[in-house]
């Protein structure tokens, strides 16, 4: 690997320095140094997580609760220990936590899923870590950690695959780093990543199609029809069941990653945790020129209220594909996608929606 590729810490120092000036969405001087330190700490923990994942089923404590795995517990413990050592992280929110866990008197709250795709571990399939950094407020009366505002200061993910990839944004583009064993850290390998303007891949679990809303069923059906249908080009379907891996492929190759609302059970009707999954990945994709939506509105504009585990449907990827799925939702709500049922022409009618390109 070429030595000209900057290390993560050097890149962050240069990348955040120009943001000390005032402006919309700008990280202030007080945050620039703190964010550099926290992102460096997260990257160091990602290295340790990658080493632990590489051990597979070797060693580790037995699961304490049904559904837990030894690997999942070990990875979560690494992230918690990092937050407790950090001078910059005031609190941590992980899946299953009732509220933000206070860790220090720092400036930031870290929202994270320490091991996305954990169910894939036994199959030796790619796993991930996803995170979002936001401002912390004053401590609450019960000693808890208060989250101040909804604006993200930084977001990113780690993908543990053939290589360990660390992808981040602080609002000035999306950038990817690869773990270099020889140099002992992450080096910049993907500067200013861009979602391709055209993509022909769908990341979706087709086994749940019967639970989707009609506009999603319409979109996926048209893609499956390929060049013989209204889309007039062929699509491929991929589904890893690891959101970080599916998002990374969409970021690199374009297309659409879909986690739609499902009707089968109300608590999971809206699929993805908003604060530590959906909005982190949405910001990364938008900073790379793509779009991210709930199907009805911009994902980054969605509000969680007081619920740190609020969930949302999620569609992200190539701009034109996200715009299409949003249009299908609007047409469905206006009743414009209903089949034309003329007793004279029925399915041969030119007025059916399928006949309109």
UniProtKB/Swiss-Prot annotation:
Keywords: Carbohydrate metabolism, Cytoplasm, Hydrolase, Plasmid. GO terms for biological process: fructose 1,6-bisphosphate metabolic process; fructose 6-phosphate metabolic process; fructose metabolic process; gluconeogenesis; sucrose biosynthetic process. It comes from the Bacteria. Signal peptide: none annotated. The keyword Hydrolase applies. It catalyses: beta-D-fructose 1,6-bisphosphate + H2O = beta-D-fructose 6-phosphate + phosphate. This is Fructose-1,6-bisphosphatase class 1 2. It comes from Paraburkholderia phymatum (strain DSM 17167 / CIP 108236 / LMG 21445 / STM815).
